[in-house]
Amino acid sequence: HYTRSNLEKKILKINPDIILFYGWSWKIKEKIFKNYKCFMLHPSLLPKYRGGSPIQNQIIRGEKMSAVTIFKINEIMDGGDIYFQKKISLMGSLSEIFKRIIVAGTKGTLKILNTKKIKIKKQNHNRATFFTRRKPEQSEITIKEIKEKPAEYIANKIRMLENPYPNAFIKLNKGKLIIKKFKIK
């Protein structure tokens, strides 16, 4: 298992030709991406939604479509050249979205590994948007949100916080009500 602290040591020991960072949440040290061919999978239509919690940040903002992007890591957070990008739907449950990400990510990885000449696309950094990783306390559905936000917003907040993420909840006098499923009628 690789962690932020043991990554460099393990990479130096293995000395790989290519490194794929899929599901990785930390910045890669320059020593690594300068000396190895490093790719990252990011579930957004880069350069939009760079940074943490891209799936949640897109869903809560009402996005219906996204993409799976595989890019070469450089010194800019989620800012490297794009080697693969495929649009995916953000509709349905989180597990359905994950399946789409896996299928598109697998196809993209195989294309990168098996194609001699790939059309590389530079990112337009002027069009980039950046978001921070969501915190567990942001999973709360507040009374203010219930009163002021449309039902679709609340539904999206619940949907984007399905397992494995900290589920949506409402604070009660003695504890909290965790919400895992919803139905709009």
Which residues fall in each region the model found?
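One-carbon transfer enzymes
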Residues: 1-185
